[in-house]
């Protein structure tokens, strides 16, 4: 619950 919240853009961890 910090980087990818509610599918906000495709983040690459």
From Swiss-Prot:
The keyword Secreted applies. GO terms for biological process: blood vessel diameter maintenance. It is found in: Secreted. Its main location: secreted. Disulfide bonds: none annotated. Belongs to the neurotensin family. This is Neurotensin. It comes from Rana temporaria. The lineage of its organism: Eukaryota, Metazoa, Chordata, Craniata, Vertebrata.
């Amino acid at each position: 619950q910090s980087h990818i919240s509610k599918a906000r853009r495709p983040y690459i961890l």
